[in-house]
Structures are given as structure tokens and as C-alpha cells.
């Protein structure tokens, strides 16, 4: 079975939620006590570890892709595209008909192309020099860190930036003028 990691005791019309693994222990436990309506039977040849990655990775990815309103014909930049959430973002953006450029380490480039990215760029490169300014409709980043400002510069006017992580560092540089002069939307 799979257990919904973000439980909503008051239903989906309420923003009240309880996060398994944050609000209480048990996100990756072998046994956990939860309400029956938060449990979903699964028949699959996947291991428990493989199945256990789906709600977190794909749930986070779908939330960012949906909230940033990715649509067919748009160009999306995905930072951290070789990780669980990032690779899910690549696949979910492609399903919506977007063109996807992925930022990854050199050793992961072929794998990220295999899962659906149209283009890959080395995470150690100068992102703006490599990709150009104002070429993406959406940036989805679950890394944070030193590339944050560069990624904002790659957004077109009216672009959307979604973030769900900071493994590259939680403190970033931001020139506020980039945000308001380009009319960007930041989504957390």
C-alpha cells in the first residue's frame, strides 16, 4: 500500500494539512497508523522502496508543475533534474507538451535525456552564458544555492519560478529589480 504523505483532515478545500515525516514520524516506516482514507492499495512489481518514493517525488513535482501552470509549447528549465523530484518534474512537464532543458552533473546527462529532457546543461557551467537570458517561460528548481539569480535571469518577462528545496544552499542572492521589472511570479 501507499500512504498519502500530505494528509488533509478537513478535505482538500482546506489548507490545513499534516505532513507525515514532518508533523509526525513514520514517512518511511515499515508500519504506521493512519486514517484508512489516506491509504491506497497498490499492485506492482516495484519494491516498497521504489513505491515509497512516488508520493514524495511525484507529489512535490506535480505541485510545482501545476502551480507554475506549465502548458504545451512552453520552455521549462529544471534544476536538479537527476534527483527524485527533478526527474519527476522533467517527465510531468513533458507529458504537458513542454520543451524541457535540464541542469545536471555531467555524469547524469545521458540518463536525464533518456527520461525525457530535450536538452541538458552542466550544472557547473555559467547558466546564463550557456543558455541565454529570457529564454524560459518557467524555471522549476528544488536545489537553490548559487544558481538562483542566474536562473531568474533566464526567465522571459512574465515568467514563473517554482522552488521546493534548498539542497544547494538556502541563502541566495536576489536583485529585486529582476523580479519586479520582469513581472516574475515566485512560487514556493
Enumerate the language-model features and the residues they cover.
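Glycine-rich phosphate-binding loop and adjacent beta-alpha segment
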Residues: 16-17, 104, 143-188
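Conserved "cap/hinge" positions at secondary-structure junctions
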Residues: 3-5, 80, 104, 165
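Short, structured coil segments at secondary-structure junctions
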Residues: 35, 115-116, 157, 182
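Short amphipathic alpha-helix with an adjacent loop that forms part of the alpha/beta core around
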Residues: 125-134
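N-terminal Rossmann-like NAD(P) cofactor-binding module of classical short-chain dehydrogenase/reductase
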Residues: 2, 137-140, 162
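Mid-domain Rossmann-like dinucleotide-binding core that forms the NAD(H)/NADP(H) cofactor-binding site
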Residues: 46-125
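Glycine-rich phosphate/adenylate-binding loop and adjacent beta-alpha elements
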Residues: 1-40
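Local beta-strand N-terminus motif with an aromatic residue
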Residues: 29, 73, 117, 135-136
